[in-house]
Amino acid sequence: MTPRPESDEAAKEYYSFEEAVMGPIGFGGPHTYRDYLAALHKTALPLNVAAMIGTGTVKICVKGFADTPYTQQELDDARALIEDAMAAGAPGVSLGIMYLPECYSSTDEFAYILEPVGRYHRVITTHIRGEGDSMVQSVREVIEIARRVGCALEISHFKSCGMKNWGKDIHTAIADIEAARAAVSYTHLRAHETCADL
């Protein structure tokens, strides 16, 4: 789940982009993660929902599909949307770095806007920037983002694309992931708790 852009112009641009894949969708909907949860609670769902907030529509909310860097004000606005979602209970943030408009964002920009994720001890899940020739660099980028944010990381659909890349860089990327996991320190190496303690 992601917030709907506040301005009608940005919302129309977003819906136009989505309709190419999803077909016609209604104009409107929640503007914030909190609004989304409120609407969700009014619906009789047959299952539990734990919806993340997506950085793609966060970016569209603050700057549309522009291929320019964030301004400081846009960075602060994007971070505030993510902060609000974390405070409302979002389990994490979903990144689609290979997709428009996120592909225009830098590592530094992601680290800045995702700062609340670490503070709230949540997770980022991501489609990396490249799964072919740039797979190793892309894996290193998201590891660096998670390290700087101080949060858990899940790489979605981890694979090596393109026949020339099969069996080539995947082992390096796996080694990088394993090294990053080994570098994470967990403060509670031992514990003892019984039901009586509770």
PLM region spans:
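Divalent-metal coordination cores built from histidine and acidic residues
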Residues: 1-91, 190
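Conserved small/polar residues in nucleotide/adenosyl-binding loops
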Residues: 187, 191-194
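A very general structural signal that marks isolated residues within well-ordered alpha-helical segments
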Residues: 55, 195-197
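Short acidic, glycine/serine/threonine-rich loops at helix termini
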Residues: 2-12, 60-66, 107, 136-140, ...
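Functional cores that coordinate and move charged inorganic groups
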Residues: 83-185
